[in-house]
């Protein structure tokens, strides 16, 4: 059984027990977050696709941890003008575990 969900503007294909990193959620570690933006659910070989979401379907995610991703460097410059700007960024994420898929 799997589901396709949306959180943080991104779509994920999840199964029960999966661990994934999503955009930062405002929840404490140990909390259970309910996602109701479920676009498709596959159960017993039957695929149910929503228009745009599947009615009554939800996915329960347990928050395990918060963190920051790998650092990326933003560097811009203008040639011949001695203009250089260097900036780093680390995107915040939340690590979650899929507890249940209800459809």
Swiss-Prot record:
Q: Which InterPro entries match?
A: bL21-like, bL21-like_sf, Ribosomal_bL21, Ribosomal_bL21_CS
Keywords of the record, alphabetical order, are: Ribonucleoprotein, Ribosomal protein, RNA-binding, rRNA-binding
Checking SUPFAM superfamilies in the record gives: L21p-like (SSF141091)
Instruction: Please list the GO terms describing molecular function.
Output: rRNA binding; structural constituent of ribosome
Cross-referenced Pfam families: Ribosomal_L21p
Cystine residue pairs: none
Biological process (GO) annotations? translation
| Gene Ontology cellular-component terms listed | cytoplasm; ribonucleoprotein complex; ribosome
Functionally, this protein is described as follows: This protein binds to 23S rRNA in the presence of protein L20.
Self-association state and partner proteins as the record states: Part of the 50S ribosomal subunit. Contacts protein L20.
Q: What family classification does the UniProt entry report for this protein?
A: Belongs to the bacterial ribosomal protein bL21 family.
The name under which this protein is listed is Large ribosomal subunit protein bL21
Source species of the chain:
Heliobacterium modesticaldum (strain ATCC 51547 / Ice1)
């Amino acid at each position: 059984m799997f589901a396709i969900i949306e959180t943080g503007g991104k779509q994920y294909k999840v199964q029960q027990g999966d661990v994934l990193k999503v955009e930062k959620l405002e929840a404490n570690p140990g909390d259970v977050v309910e996602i109701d933006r479920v676009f498709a659910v596959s159960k017993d070989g039957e695929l149910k696709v929503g228009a745009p979401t599947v009615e009554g379907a939800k996915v329960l995610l347990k928050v395990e941890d918060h963190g920051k991703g790998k650092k990326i460097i933003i560097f811009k410059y203008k040639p011949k003008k001695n203009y250089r700007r260097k900036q780093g960024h680390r995107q915040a994420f939340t690590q979650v575990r899929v507890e249940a898929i209800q459809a």
